[in-house]
Structures are given as structure tokens and as C-alpha cells.
UniProtKB/Swiss-Prot annotation:
The gene is mutS1. This protein is involved in the repair of mismatches in DNA. It is possible that it carries out the mismatch recognition step. This protein has a weak ATPase activity. Disulfide bonds: none annotated. SUPFAM superfamilies: DNA repair protein MutS, domain I, DNA repair protein MutS, domain II, DNA repair protein MutS, domain III, P-loop containing nucleoside triphosphate hydrolases. This is DNA mismatch repair protein MutS.
Length: 884
């Protein structure tokens, strides 16, 4: 914003794009109010308040010399969030000015902290020349940082995509548009409103935009920052115009999204928002991608959580599937691996292409990975070039990375992999741009442009001449010093420089009477005098001028270079994509060799057959790991899994789902063999957790997740259910578990692994021929239990709950009391069932009533001899005698 003084007032000019984002009517009112009060403030505060009015919901970092200052409410908020000092200095409009500031050179660390906290920041720089300014130096907002529009390397996680998402509502659908500003990837999709929570979990946006007249419960549950925009910013006609202008097309038919009206509205609002924050035309955003739900296996929020894809149930990053597989050697590969794990492919042709590439790379990854390791983050460096926010070391890093690609092309042998052949072609480097980078940028440039030392020698004649003046400075000063010593006869005369007084001749106080007449005193100290001569002054002006002009010339050349590199952006994006895919595929090959994984086989026939499958993460933590097989088909749809706690039921179910997921990502799997038919979704209901924030009990969460499965699972879905019904009374829980299993068998007809401790439920295989029983084996050893962890056909004989309780450290007296109570309950149950003519196959087969325990024995079992005093021991003896 520029402030102009006119008849004592202030005219505030506001760019059209700002008006478009904030609402013309509302903004006009705000500016009118501001216009009427600005004259009561100091000139500098008038300028600040005018800028702040444009960004009322952002922290404004206002550049003043070597600091970014924040004022008033911004200062208080920044002080609280950043732990910086809040002060009061001077006054404006009769009130003290509240201030807080951060050093300019250390600003990035504070910006990074604010970004993590979800705050938006407007960076206001000095753009005018202080020497030519009559009032406050002209300032403009040059950069806006919001959580979803970060591109600076210091503000981003190398292993995660940073996504900005916009949501628009249409007739019965929601339009989603998301953009990764650091890569230029722009993706549209449409979903039914009921799938929004699932999509937010999958996309995991850093920031969400949505119209002010839209509400959905899922928005309350997501933790990222959210920004409401005026509904008119999602106008369909305006959005179409914004998008066609960006892509220089007549319409959107070529992108396959012309019929996706809600998604187009979201995309238009999103693109306008990004243009506003970045203050550029976004040249690296060159296309739209339409994402169809059928492209990927659907994983709901519960499934992503329960499978611990990249976060444990405790919220930690390790041990997870991602942490196990992530031996990638590039930042781009690390991000792509995470994305692939969250987006398993559904189309078998695409999966087979990846698997074939992995197979080919098993013989090549040793030669490829050292070259890949030398490739920097081309994707994000190229994005910063596009946005013209690149720093000198972005360009040197880009240059060094691009120089690795020809060698990578030569070493890669695609053989019979069409995917690898395509990636090899994508590694073609735009040579003209690379030559420009090689010629223009020093081998090791300065970190920031203002320090100089960025543009290579020989690139620009004018810059070379200015540098020559500076480099010859030392030689001139030596000659001048020798000349003046000889001319003055003062042998200890020195010529020196400091940043305050510039160049000077230093002479001791005792010899100051002998100086030549043309010496002019510059500074007097205790023991020395400092002088300047016309010749030295002329040289000083020349050197200092050369330094300033050299820095200005370097900035001009650097900015010009960024402009000249724009045509290479599309090619660099292809390079980045190829490197990322090669890195992940080579990682899959390396992991397959090291971890002894095999290639899965895909079939058009329904079913799932895994021989000696292993849990990829657990097998690395527990050795030896017992492998187990699983077989599901249209004739064996539901496996009812029984067995003791800690026997491995949950591990068995999770490993089945993870093997299916890995296979659909194009990765080899931990098994002896795996044949997988068509799968469209994976559902899980495992573990117990409540939702206190949402006001839902553990049982309510369980039932909600189960309802989602029953409503959405198909005959091509894989369903994992663990302990359904345990959060309520025994009969309620058993009834619910039976009804859920029946629904899955009769209606959904999904492939289901159903773990339970309700032994009565095992009879369901007698009623439904497509259900079968398996169990995790265990054997008793003395008073304890040994878990065998192997899966056997048929139901378990007992749960071994008391033995597990003993292993957990439950006091022996409690365990013994439980055993006695168990006998009573089992006797009662057998009697009731016998009277009804319905004996339980488990109870009837296993109940062997123990004789009643003598009171003396019970008392002795409760005694801890080591803790008794002599007096207490005597009392116990008297008590025992009475019990006989």
C-alpha cells in the first residue's frame, strides 16, 4: 500500500485483489473509518495503520531498520506466542505505543514457530530509499505467509506435503480443490457430504478455506487452521474466468472437469487466495488434475489410525509402516512415499507397472541410490524460482541437483518396465537453463543476496569492474601508506578503515605537528590523531560507491536470472516427479531385499490368499516372529478369530490389512506368497478409545465406527473387527456382535476378520456356511501360559484370561479369588443350560469343578509372612487354630 498526503488527509489505495478477498463493501467501510482517524497519529503510525487495515486478521511484521516490529494487539499476541519482550515506547493518538520486535536476520525462526502455530503473517518491507524520503520510508507488504502457502525451506517439513484445501458446496456434492504450492500440483475432486471427514483425514491439509455460509461437523473436528471467505468469492463464473486465465485456455473441457461445478468454485477461490498471498502470477501452476474416488482404495480415518501407517496410536512417528519403509535418499522421495502409503492404488494395471519397476530395480538400486542421494529438493527449489522467492543457495542447489540427472539417466536400465522407461525420459534436463545457472551462480554463493558474493565472476562485465575496484583496495592502501610515510617522514604512519569513520591516516599525538598541510583531522583519540586527505577521500568514495553499486548490480542480475529461468519450470517439475518416483521404487526394491519381501500376485477372481504372512513392523520388534496364513473367498467370507488376550489376534488382522495395502501401493509384501483379488476399501474397528472432546464414550465410538462399516462396506471390501460389543453388558454385546457378523455375511458380503471373546459367537459357522472359525493357539505351563501365536482352524477352547492377568502382575490373592468365582459361574451356567436342554460346547467340555477350598488354606494364601511382626504372627496362629 502507498500512503499519499492530500489536503492533510490520507488516501489509501487498496489493490483489487485485496478487495476481492475481503469484500468490497466491508473494506470500504473500514477504510473510511480509518481515514477519519489517521490524522490523530504520527506519520509512521499512520503508515502502519493503513497497512494493518488491509490485513486485519494477520500479524504484520513491519520492517524498521534491522528489526521487524509489531504494534498494539499484534505485539501482545506475538509476545505471548513467541516469548518476546512487550514494551511501550512513545505515544500516538495520545496513547503509549505497544511494541514487540524480532531481529531481521533471525526472523525465519520466529516465522517458522508462528507457522507451526497456524498463524498468518504479512511481511512489510522498506521499498523506498531512506535518503530520498521526506516522511516515513515507503513500505509495502511483499510476502504473506499462511499455514497452507508456505514455500520457504526453513518453514516446511521435508517429508510432508504442505497442502491448502478449499471447499465449496453444490447440489448434493462438495467440491474440493487442493494445491501444493511448493510443487505446483493442483487437484480437484467432488464427494458426497458424508465423506468429508474421511477426505480431510486423507488429505491432511495445512489450511482450509470455505465459504462463510457453509457448515459441516467435520470442520470442527479437524485441527488445522481454517479461514472463512465471503460466499461471492466462490462465484462460478468468476472461478471459471480465473482458471481459464491461469491456464490460457478457452474453457475447462480439456481438464475433464467442466461438469464439476462445485470443484470449479473451490478451485477459483483457492487460486485467487494464493495469488493474493504470493503476489505473483504463479507460473509453476500449469495444469489441473481431476481425482476420482475409484483411483484409490478408500481408507477411512479409523483405518489410517488403527493401521499406524505413519503415526502410532500414541501419536508418535515410530515405529510405523512409514518409518520402516522410509530409507528414501531424497526429500521428494520421502514425501511421495508417505503419499503412496495413504493412497493405495485400485487399478491393477497401475499396480503391476510399479511392481515390475521394483523387480527391475532389485538389480540396480545399489548403483542408483548414490546418485539420487546427491539430488536436492528440485520440486521446492523450482517452486521458489517460480514465486521469485528463491535464495542464492536455492539456485546453486538446483544447479548441482540438475547436473546429477544425466548420470542417473545413463545408469538407469529400464529393461521391460514401461514405467521406468517413462521416468528415464522425464529426466531430460533443459540445458539452456542449466547452462545459465552454471554461468551465473558461484560454486558456493552467500546465504543471502544482501551479503553479495552470489553472481559468478565473468558473468557480467559491469559487476566484474566494480569488484576489481574493491579487490584492488588493499594494494592501493599499501602503496598510499608507503607514499605518505616517505612524503611526511613519519615512519609509523598507518592507513586503516572502520565502518564509522571510513578510511583514515593514523599518527601518534607526538608526531601530529609534522603532518603535511593538506591533512584534515577526522578524529582525535587519547594517544593518536586520525586524518583524511583529498586523495584518500576520493578513493574512499570510489570504493564505497563500488560496493553499493556491486550489491545493487548483483540484485538486479539475480532478479533478472529468476525471470529468465521461468520457461524451464515445467521441465523441472517433470524432473522432480521422476526423481521422487525413482527414489520410492528403488526404496521398495531395497526393502524387499533386506526384509525378504515377495512380489504379490493380483487376480481378477475374488478372494485373498496369503501364505505365511508377517506383520511388517512387529516382526522387526519381536524375534522370532511367527508367520500365519489367511484365506478368504466368496465361500469363506468371514473368519471368526478366538484365542487368548496377547495371543496375537489384533496383530494377525492388522498384518493382513497391511499386506493388502502394501501390495496396492506397488510394494513387495512380507509373506511367502500372496494372491489378492479386487479390493475397493479397507475398514478397521480395532482397539478401545473414547472421544472426550466430542462427548462420545468408548462404546459410542465403537458403534459409530461399526455403523460406518455396515453402511459402506461392499463385497470387495476388507473388514477387520475386534471385540465388537465389549463396551456394554454381556448379553447386549453378544447380541450386537452376532447381528453385525450376520449383516456382514448376508448383506455386505465383505471379506471379514472378526476377533471376539464371545465363544458363543463361534456357533455362527453352523448357521452360515460362508463363516469359519480359526484361533490363536496357546498352552498352559504350570500356573502360567505360553503363547504360540500360530493360527489354527477351529474355535479356541478357552480364553486364558486369568493366566494373562497373572502375567500382568495382578496379586496372586486376586487371581485365586477369580479362579474360585469362575468355577461358581461356570457351574451355574452349566446347570441353567442343562435345565434348558442347551449345553454350551465350551463349558460342558472343559468345566471340572474343584473341591471347595478349606478356610485355613484361604487364610494362609492371603498371608505375607515377610511383612508380619512377631505379634501379628502370633495373632494369625490363634486365628488359624480357631478355623480348624
Amino acid at each position: 500500500m502507498h500512503g499519499e498526503h492530500d489536503r492533510g488527509g490520507v488516501i489509501i489505495k487498496v489493490c483489487d485483489d485485496v478487495l476481492a478477498l475481503a469484500g468490497k463493501h466491508e473494506r470500504a467501510i473500514n477504510l473510511t473509518k480509518l481515514d477519519n482517524t489517521l490524522e490523530q497519529h504520527t506519520p509512521m503510525m499512520r503508515q502502519y495503520l493503513g497497512i494493518k487495515a488491509q490485513y486485519p486478521d494477520m500479524l504484520v511484521f513491519y520492517r524498521m531498520g534491522d528489526f521487524y516490529e509489531l504494534f498494539h494487539d499484534d505485539a501482545e499476541k506475538a509476545s505471548r506466542l513467541l516469548g518476546i519482550t512487550l514494551t511501550k515506547r512513545g505515544s500516538s493518538n495520545g496513547e503509549p505505543i505497544r511494541m514487540a520486535g524480532v531481529p531481521y536476520h533471525a526472523a525465519e525462526q520466529y516465522l517458522a514457530k508462528l507457522a507451526k502455530l497456524g498463524e498468518a503473517v504479512a511481511i512489510c518491507e522498506q521499498v523506498g530509499d531512506p535518503a530520498k524520503s521526506k516522511g516515513p520510508v515507503e513500505r509495502q507488504v511483499t510476502r504473506i505467509l499462511t499455514p497452507g502457502t508456505l514455500t520457504d525451506a526453513a518453514l516446511l517439513d521435508d517429508t510432508r506435503d504442505n497442502l491448502l484445501l478449499a471447499i465449496a458446496h453444490g447440489e448434493g456434492v462438495l467440491g474440493l480443490a487442493r494445491i501444493n504450492l511448493a510443487s505446483g500440483r493442483f487437484i480437484l475432486s467432488e464427494i458426497t457430504p458424508g465423506l468429508l471427514a474421511q477426505e480431510l483425514e486423507r488429505i491432511s491439509p495445512a489450511e482450509i478455506l470455505y465459504p462463510d455460509d457453509f457448515y459441516h461437523m467435520a470442520l470442527e473436528q479437524v485441527k488445522c487452521p481454517k479461514k472463512r471467505l465471503a460466499p461471492w468469492q466462490f462465484d462460478l463464473d468468476s472461478s471459471i474466468q480465473t482458471l481459464t486465465k491461469q491456464f490460457s485456455t478457452y474453457d475447462l473441457d480439456g481438464f475433464g472437469c467442466a461438469h464439476m461445478l462445485a470443484a470449479i468454485m473451490a478451485a477459483g477461490a483457492l487460486l485467487d487466495y494464493v495469488k493474493h498471498t504470493q503476489r505473483t502470477s504463479l507460473p509453476h501452476i500449469q495444469s489441473l488434475m481431476v481425482e476420482q474416488g475409484s483411483q484409490f482404495i478408500q481408507l477411512d480415518a479409523a483405518t489410517r489410525r488403527n493401521l499406524e501407517i505413519d503415526q502410532t496410536l500414541r501419536g508418535e512417528s515410530s515405529p510405523t509402516l512409514y518409518s520402516l519403509l522410509n530409507t528414501t535418499v531424497t526429500a521428494m522421495g520421502a514425501r511421495l512415499l508417505r503419499s503412496w502409503l495413504h493412497h493405495p492404488l485400485q487399478h491393477q494395471a497401475d499396480i503391476q507397472a510399479r511392481l515390475q519397476a521394483v523387480k527391475v530395480l532389485q538389480a540396480q538400486y545399489d548403483g542408483l541410490r548414490p546418485l539420487l542421494r546427491n539430488v536436492g529438493d528440485i520440486e521446492r527449489m523450482a517452486a521458489r524460482v517460480a514465486l521469485k522467492t528463491a535464495r542464492p543457495r536455492d539456485l546453486s542447489g538446483l544447479r548441482d541437483s540438475l547436473q546429477q540427472l544425466p548420470a542417473l539417466q545413463r545408469v538407469l536400465r529400464p529393461e521391460d518396465s514401461a514405467l521406468l522407461h517413462s521416468l528415464q525420459q522425464q529426466l531430460d534436463v533443459p540445458q539452456a537453463a542449466l547452462d545459465m545457472l552454471i554461468a551465473a551462480i558461484k560454486d558456493e554463493p552467500a546465504a543471502v543476496l544482501r551479503e553479495g558474493g552470489v553472481i559468478a565472476d565473468g558473468f557480467d562485465a559491469e559487476l566484474d569492474e566494480l569488484r576489481a575496484i574493491q579487490s584492488n583496495c588493499g594494494e592501493f592502501l599499501l602503496q598510499f601508506e608507503a607514499q605518505e610515510r616517505e612524503r611526511s617522514g613519519i615512519s609509523n604512519l598507518k592507513v586503516e578503515y572502520n565502518s564509522v569513520h571510513g578510511f583514515y591516516i593514523e599518527i601518534s599525538r607526538a608526531q601530529s605537528e609534522n603532518v603535511p598541510a593538506e591533512y584534515r583531522r577526522r578524529q582525535t583519540l587519547k594517544n593518536v590523531e586520525r586524518y583524511i586527505t583529498p586523495e584518500l577521500k576520493t578513493f574512499e568514495d570510489k570504493v564505497l560507491s563500488a560496493n553499493e553499486r556491486a550489491l545493487a548490480r548483483e540484485k538486479f542480475l539475480f532478479d533478472e536470472l529468476l525471470g529468465n529461468l521461468q520457461p524451464a519450470l515445467a521441465a523441472w517439475q517433470r524432473n522432480a516427479e521422476a526423481v521422487a518416483q525413482l527414489d520410492v521404487l528403488a526404496t521398495f526394491a531395497e526393502r524387499a531385499d533386506v526384509l525378504k519381501y515377495v512380489a504379490p500376485q493380483f487376480s481378477s477372481e475374488a478372494g485373498l490368499d496369503i501364505v505365511d504372512g508377517r506383520h511388517p513392523v512387529v516382526e522387526q520388534l519381536a524375534q522370532p516372529f511367527i508367520a500365519n496364513s489367511v484365506s478368504l473367498s466368496p465361500y469363506r467370507q468371514l473368519l471368526l478369530i478366538t484365542g487368548p488376550n496377547m495371543g496375537g489376534k489384533s496383530t494377525y488382522m492388522r498384518q493382513t490389512a497391511l499386506i493388502v495395502l502394501l501390495a496396492h501401493c506397488g510394494c513387495f509384501v512380507p509373506a511367502k506368497s500372496a494372491r489378492i483379488g479386487p479390493i475397493d476399501r479397507i475398514f478397521t474397528r480395532i482397539g478401545a478409545s473414547d472421544d472426550l472432546a466430542g462427548g462420545r464414550s468408548t462404546f459410542m465410538v465403537e458403534m459409530t465406527e461399526t455403523a460406518n462399516i455396515l453402511h459402506n462396506a461392499t463385497e470387495r471390501s476388507l473388514v477387520l473387527l475386534d471385540e465388537i460389543g465389549r463396551g456394554t453388558s454381556t448379553f447386549d454385546g453378544l447380541s450386537l456382535a452376532w447381528a453385525v457378523a450376520r449383516q456382514l455375511l448376508e448383506k455386505n458380503r465383505s471379506y471379514t476378520l472378526f476377533a471376539t471373546h464371545y465363544f458363543e459367537l463361534t456357533r455362527i459357522s453352523e448357521e452360515f456356511k460362508h463363516a469359519a472359525n480359526v484361533h490363536l493357539d496357546a498352552v498352559e505351563h504350570g500356573d502360567g501360559i505360553v503363547f504360540l501365536h500360530n493360527v489354527e482352524e477351529g474355535p479356541a477352547s478357552q480364553s486364558y484370561g486369568l493366566q494373562v492377568a497373572q502375567l500382568a502382575g495382578i496379586p496372586r490373592t486376586v487371581v485365586n479369588a477369580a479362579k474360585r468365582k469362575l468355577v461358581q459361574l461356570e457351574q451355574s451356567q452349566v446347570m441353567q443350560q442343562s435345565l434348558a436342554g442347551q449345553g454350551d460346547m465350551f463349558v460342558a467340555a472343559n468345566v471340572e469343578p474343584e473341591p471347595a477350598t478349606h478356610p485355613v488354606v484361604s487364610e494362609l494364601e492371603s498371608i505375607d509372612p515377610d511383612s508380619l511382626t512377631p505379634r501379628q504372627a502370633l495373632d494369625v496362629l490363634y486365628k488359624l487354630k480357631k478355623l480348624i
